Amino acid sequence: MTVKIYDTPEVQDFLKIVAGLDQEGGNDRGKQIIHRILSDLYRTIDDFDITAEQYWSAVSLLNALGQASQFGLLSPGLGFDHYMDMRMDAADAEAKRTGGTPRTIEGPLYVAGAPEAEGFARMDDDPDTDGETMWLHGQVRDTAGKPIPGAKVEIWHCNSKGGYSFFDKSQTPYNLRRTIIADNEGYYRARSVIPSGYGVPEGAPTDQVLKLLGRHGERPAHIHYFISAPGHQHLTTQINLAGDPYTYDDFAFATRQDLAAEGKRVENHPAAQQYGVEGTVTEVIFNIELSPTAEEELQARP
């Protein structure tokens, strides 16, 4: 069947009715957005001669994504999260807001309310016999290189098995999640465990979509950050650990050139020992630059 009816007056009038454009109530912007989305989908059905069977198969997949709470997982896989970053980068460039550590995607696994500590935090509440001890630290400064005392550094990551607290019910709440207030020189420090990379669940709805596209669903080992300070632009970012096979092949498109960090094995690290962290550690250093701004809305999480 090669029927094409999208451009007919009947279909165009029908689209306006479906989107509520003939009604006085509702939200005008919402109507325009729905009209655009429906128009593009209707045209796609025409252009690719999508059958009723194929349509209902897609509906079943959407239902499965919802039941598995995987829309937040598929979103970065289809590039939506990175596209939003690209738009924010373009807005910064247009406003001549330059410099600072690059942003990258937040991901769906942030949980507010992590315990707060001054200068140093131990993040690993749960034993992780397979995990390497991580000594994670860095300095928060402005684009002129001046330290930012009191900067708020929120950090979260998975354990050595790829699970996140709250989502992996075997973990203590807020395991591997902390908020650290940088010291008078802008430094933050944490003891934790080296996270592992992980993939989307085999056979899950997200995996089905990615396989349809001939793509994998793997993420490298990575660590998430929110960083904020008065008078500076809020930063959402993450670092991928160098040496992971997917460091530069992240299905979520989160890798950026300046956001890969090396892990270095150190015996009896002197600075770590000052905070009670003994033995062999894997040191990961991530220094952060925040861009100055007087706009209050840019100082908060987008």
From Swiss-Prot:
What's its EC? 1.13.11.1
The catalysed reaction is: catechol + O2 = cis,cis-muconate + 2 H(+)
Which key words are in the record?
A: Aromatic hydrocarbons catabolism, Dioxygenase, Iron, Metal-binding, Oxidoreductase, Plasmid
Please name the GO terms of the biological process aspect recorded for this protein, alphabetically. Answer: beta-ketoadipate pathway; catechol-containing compound catabolic process
Protein's name in the database: Catechol 1,2-dioxygenase
Instruction: Identify its protein family.
Output: Belongs to the intradiol ring-cleavage dioxygenase family.
Task: Give the metabolic or biological pathway.
Answer: Aromatic compound metabolism; beta-ketoadipate pathway; 5-oxo-4,5-dihydro-2-furylacetate from catechol: step 1/3
> Could you read off the lineage of the organism from its UniProt record?
Bacteria, Pseudomonadati, Pseudomonadota
